[in-house]
Amino acid sequence: MKNPQRLPDLSRRTFLKGSSFSTLMSMLGGVPLVAQEKPTEPAAGKPVGRPVNCGVIGLGPWGREILATLSKIPEANIVAICDTYAPMLRRGQQSAPKAAATDDYKAVLENKEVEAVFVATPPHQHRELAVAALKAGKHVYCEAPLAHTIEDARAIAQAAKASFKSVFQCGLQARSHPQRHFLLQFIRSGAMGKPVMARAQWHRKQSWRFASPNADREKEINWRLSRKTSPGLIGEVGIHQLDAVTWFLDQRPLAVTGFGSLIKWTEDNRDVPDTIQAVLEYPQGVHLTYDSTLANSFEADYEVYYGSDSAIMVRDNKAWMFKEVDAPLLGWEVYARKDSFYKETGIALVANASKLEAQGEGGTADSAAAINSLTFALQAFLGNAGKVATAVKDFKENFGEDDEALKEHLADVRKSRLPAAGYQEGFDAVVVALKANEAILGKKRIQFQKEWFDLG
């Protein structure tokens, strides 16, 4: 798998030699792994670029979360919001009281003030909205999954690829979080040893059903419960964890086997399984075991990456490393605090600025993890959109209309972009997740074909 955001190859020696003191400390057994620098919280910090005029389409629970997060980011200026359901539109206005409110998405796209559009509707509606927004010359942030079919996702990705003046970002938020980038560097450096296997889960005891006094409206808002409109648990939720594993391993899966059952929520005529398991096969014999359920909440969600020298557990953007007894010693144990993890004892990072100068003044081990992935993702999108818009404006003022030259110029500009999931990453994630869902529904094994990932 060729990853455009791939880091330079790092040897174990290079990684250890170039790491900060806090990073070296984090490589001890059972250590919370933290990003090397404490980020400035976007809500309280200075804008990293000029404000971008934003329009949000889709004001359900997640759309309102995006809206609320944007309202705290200095780079965002919310000028338009849209939802076809009046009560949702009114709730959205609480976070954006000055924004133009409409029930017609075309009004948002025709609004010349709007520079960037956020698509937060159900996935089966994404294609029409995202493609139209790109054709209107807008920057587009489209939630994950890109679509509920591979055909629709491919159409969106192809439109994004063709719209070279626009920034397109898929809502795989973890790809923008600095903690994840630290783990990416750590795993690819070989410090974990040889990758052996991975495990991930998402458990929530909830029905996924929303109530409404209107029967038609109730059917509309419960799109997750019908196979016609739902990508299932693995496509709606699991896509983020599957993408993380694929990203960290820098390999697409070779095959997937799945199983799914409707066990708990059997009385409302849904046909989407509430409990699923999937095994994804990667090169070199590495397997990811994934499970998700709406019937039990125990242990919530996490990922574990197993290597020949250590295992890494990731929860809530925090991570801990558990070393094998025969793993190489790093020599910093004297500075570390020991924590208990059930029957195991790990060595914890001491958050002490007097000893760990790399933590920075007032820094803590949780400083990066305290900011959610959505904030980092939206800030990356806005920063990249502002940078590209400025580059286009400056180029045209100096060189006029020359699309080929402009395309080359923007390719250089994008080399310094903030980390985020683009159209290819978003499309690849959809192919993996939707094929996994197909395997789950059919209780079968599916081999991935190279051409499924091709955008032409």
Residue ranges and their predicted role:
Residues 18, 22-96, 245:
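N-terminal Rossmann-like dinucleotide-binding module
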Residues 58-62, 162-169, 173-270, 300-304, ...:
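Predominantly a Rossmann-like dinucleotide-binding segment in NAD(P)-dependent oxidoreductases
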Residues 17-27, 39, 65, 240-246, ...:
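C-terminal helical cap and adjacent loop that interface with cofactors, partners, or active-site loops
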Residues 100-115, 119:
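A structured beta-alpha segment of the ubiquitous adenosine-cofactor-binding alpha/beta core
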Residues 279-284, 307:
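Active-site beta-strand termini and strand-to-loop segments that position acidic
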Residues 116, 122-123, 127-175, 190, ...:
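Beta-strand-loop-alpha-helix segment that lines the small-molecule cofactor/substrate pocket
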Residues 2-23:
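N-terminal secretory signal peptides and thylakoid transit peptides that target proteins
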